[in-house]
A protein has these predicted regions:
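Structural motif
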Residues: 62, 69-71, 78, 94, ...
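Short beta-strand His + acidic residue motifs that chelate non-heme Fe in jelly-roll/DSBH
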Residues: 72-73, 89, 95-101
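Double-stranded beta-helix
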Residues: 98-130
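Short acidic-glycine-tyrosine-enriched beta hairpin
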Residues: 76-91
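A short, N-terminal "cap"/entry segment at the start of jelly-roll beta-barrel domains
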Residues: 1-37, 43-44, 52, 120-130
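Short, conserved beta-strand element in jelly-roll/cupin
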Residues: 40-43, 55-72
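Short histidine-centered beta-strand/loop micro-motifs
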Residues: 27-28, 49-57, 98-100
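Short strand-coil-strand connectors
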Residues: 31-33, 73-77
Length: 130
């Protein structure tokens, strides 16, 4: 018997609450044991600019922009990333993502799945001033 799971975006809870856009963490919903997989929709003028950034202790991430153009602040660099483009970010690199607009942007974030996320994340308040 084959072992697989299928889930549509609307099958996975949006963890952003009242914050504009969507962030849907598929990992648990599909029972992924090794891969962390997150879908995010970012309306114009949303993201981490004017706020925080984050880094990881051990977890490498790959961000894949599906549609729109996003600004990534990666350490001291700010780069524009368009559709159908992947960005690999090493664990200690502080990062944040911003959608300047005018349209919504969609992206997927992939990494290795970790059981203990609490000690993995390092928040950096004021990382990307406006």
């Amino acid at each position: 018997m084959s072992d697989y799971t299928i889930a549509a975006v609307d099958d996975v809870p949006d963890v952003l609450g009242d914050y504009p856009g969507e962030m849907r963490m598929f990992t648990g919903s599909i029972g992924a044991e090794q891969v962390a997989f997150t879908y995010r929709r970012m309306p114009a003028q949303t993201g981490g600019k004017g706020g925080y950034g984050h880094a990881h202790r051990t977890q490498e991430e790959i961000y894949f922009v599906i549609s729109g153009t996003l600004q990534f602040k990666l350490g001291d660099d700010v780069v524009d990333v368009g559709p159908k483009t992947a960005v690999r970010i090493a664990p200690p690199t502080v990062r944040s993502v911003w959608n300047e607009g005018p349209d919504d942007a969609e992206l997927v974030i992939c990494s290795v799945r970790l059981e203990d996320q609490v000690d993995e994340h390092e928040m950096h308040e004021g990382f990307w001033p406006q």
